[in-house]
Design a protein with these regions (language model features):
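Positively charged n-region of N-terminal signal peptides that target proteins for export
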Residues: 1-4
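Bacterial N-terminal signal peptides
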Residues: 6-17
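Boundary at the C-terminal end of the N-terminal hydrophobic targeting segment
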Residues: 19-24
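Divalent metal-binding segments
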Residues: 26-32, 41-297, 310-357, 361, ...
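Distinct, well-ordered alpha-helical segments
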Residues: 263-265, 291-302, 362-375, 398
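Phosphate/diphosphate-binding loops
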Residues: 274-308, 382-393, 419-444
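His/Asp/Glu-enriched, well-ordered alpha-helical/loop segment
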Residues: 343-353, 360-383, 393-397, 408-530, ...
């Protein structure tokens, strides 16, 4: 009889959220007396949870979970603080952002040009003369009281002895004279394709270079790279910065300026067991016209899903074919090329994420997807479209039928005023149509598209989701398109995990799942909406390891020794 009863008790404990770990082994860590937002329908909130061997073994009341503690268990009193599942950015260019983290200045949270210049000045004071200072994006003039871009004179006053490069999205960059000299730019002929030096009415250069994606990416390519050892260290630092904001995972869609060596610092941290963020990455298109050939070659050595829980290859995108990248009027030949790539990917059961900005042209992409789907059902592959802020009900309906998900970022937080001016209020009030997509049952992943376009701060993105306001405070979306706080949090956790086939392993807090979580500085569910963006983590755990801790929990951060 004993052999029958024990399994039944284990099942009962597991379904109650307490797991089967009560038999014989103590938890490594127990968190007590908190407000735990689990996103588990069976137990939406809890007071405590226990962790062992990197996984959650119990979730429930403090009294129940305390039973999992024993000799050697680390006990953490949450003192009523809110805990959420670890945040997962479903579309962040984290690998690239990490490489320049040490030399970059961010303007996140600055509300005036003098405040932004103070950050430049502080960077100059801690830098050697001649050392580069870079603002690689993540800002807009709408965040400043002045509602304008900074000037070259303002940069010079803040950093007279350093070359300074300030990027505005992928449309413009401001350089100081020292930066122009270092990059050997004196005339328009020296500017990468499609770009030009902006000049005032009297012909005097303003310091700004105006262009498009190839222009600005070409400029960035000219900036000096850190050494390999420096890149490893700054990647470690950048991931800790993400941990400070409760981020435990990212999906990286490749990007401009990324070459094979760009991935080596990430791989080094992985090999050393020193990653603190789970990274899932995809392969950006390489040679124009040779995209399919390149995918076929690379994936013979790097198959779909290769890696582990910390670093894993997850297919191709976000640029799948150069001829279809930001192309609203593709030729039949370009559509055929995309079809051949998608057809091959479907035959290999490979995931794809596709960059697409405008609803007016997304029918070209959907036509290709439907053609592939008639031959090989694509819903099981969890393909996705990224961006598409103005998606129409018709486009969303076609996505739903195909089983294609939507990777949504807070572009309208930074670009809302410009979108409103260009498209008008009727389009703005539905940009993006979050609740329309949710009610259709389309999988949605939350993210930022950081860091050249937006800030990597997930709480800024979450605040924008629920209040619909731009960085300048302009209301945009209709109330009917505003998700609840829990819905928004779900996009950033379980929603993002779905796209990497991880929703059964992470994204919510329940027994058996990976112990990825964040203890927050404020109650995400009840703090004033306008304060959500100021939220940070006091403690971040990934796989049971406390990778970031501050304030009352600083003692718990686990420092991994540097490799020999």
């Amino acid at each position: 009889m004993k052999s029958i009863i024990a399994p039944l008790v284990a099942v009962a404990l597991s379904t109650s959220g307490l797991g089967s770990a009560a038999f014989g082994q103590n938890a490594d860590t127990v968190l007590l007396n908190g407000k735990i937002v689990t996103l588990d329908a069976a137990m939406p909130t809890a007071e405590a949870l226990a962790v062992r061997d990197g996984k959650i073994v119990a979730v429930g009341t403090s009294a129940d979970v305390r039973a999992f503690a024993g000799a050697g268990t680390r006990m953490i009193d949450l003192e009523g603080r809110t805990v959420v599942p670890g945040l997962i950015d479903s579309h962040m260019h984290a690998i690239r952002a990490a490489l320049f983290y040490a030399t970059e200045v961010n303007w996140i949270g600055t509300s005036s040009i003098p405040a932004a210049m103070e950050r430049i000045k502080a960077a100059a004071q801690r830098s050697k003369p001649g050392q580069w200072i870079i603002v690689a994006g993540g800002w807009t003039e709408q965040q400043f009281r002045e509602k304008r871009r900074p000037t070259q004179a303002e940069l010079l006053a803040a950093a007279p002895d350093n070359p300074v490069y300030v990027q505005l999205f992928y449309s413009a960059a401001l350089l100081t004279p020292a930066a122009y000299k270092a990059l050997n730019i004196t005339t328009d002929a020296d500017v990468p394709p499609s770009g030009k030096i902006e000049r005032a009415a009297d012909g005097t250069p303003t310091g700004w270079i105006i262009g498009d994606n190839p222009t600005i990416s070409g400029l960035f390519d000219k900036l000096p790279l850190p050494t390999f050892d420096e890149s490893v260290e700054v990647t470690r630092q950048f991931f800790r910065e993400l941990n400070r904001l409760g981020i435990t995972g990212v999906s990286d869609p490749g990007g401009f300026n990324l070459t094979a060596p760009s991935y080596q610092p990430l791989f080094k941290l992985w090999q050393d067991g020193a990653l603190t963020v789970r990274v899932v990455y995809s392969l950006f298109a390489q040679r124009r016209g040779k995209e399919l050939e390149d995918y076929q070659t690379v994936t013979q050595m790097l198959p779909m899903g290769f890696g582990d829980d910390w670093l894993r290859f997850n297919g191709i995108g976000e640029n799948v074919a150069w001829g279809m990248y930001n192309n609203d009027n593709p030729t039949e030949a370009q559509k055929e090329q995309l079809y051949q790539i998608y057809k091959w990917a479907a035959s290999r059961r490979m995931t794809i994420t596709q960059h697409w900005n405008n609803n007016r042209s997304v029918h070209h992409l959907l036509d290709v997807l439907e053609r592939v789907d008639r031959e090989t059902p694509i819903a099981p592959l969890r393909w996705s479209i990224a961006h598409l802020n103005d998606a129409s009900p018709e486009s969303l309906g076609r996505m739903k039928t195909l089983g294609v998900g939507w990777l949504m970022q807070n572009a309208m937080y930074f670009n809302g005023e410009a979108f409103l001016k260009a498209r008008g209020n009727e389009a703005m009030r539905l940009a993006p149509p979050i609740m329309t997509a949710l009610k259709l049952g389309i999988p949605i992943g939350g993210g930022t598209d950081a860091h050249r376009v937006m800030s990597y701060n997930p709480f800024v993105s979450l605040q924008w989701m629920v209040d619909g306001k731009t960085v300048g405070g302009t209301p945009t979306r209709d109330e009917e398109q505003l998700p609840t706080r829990e819905e928004a949090l779900r996009f950033y956790t379980l929603g993002s995990a779905w796209f990497t086939f991880d929703d059964e392993r992470r994204g919510s807090l329940k027994a058996g799942k990976l112990a990825d979580l964040a203890v927050l500085t404020r109650d995400y569910l009840t703090t004033p909406t306008g304060d959500i963006g100021a939220t940070e983590a006091l403690l971040t755990m990934v796989g049971g390891r406390i990778v970031y801790a501050a304030g009352p929990y600083a003692q718990f951060e686990e420092k991994r020794p540097a490799p020999p």
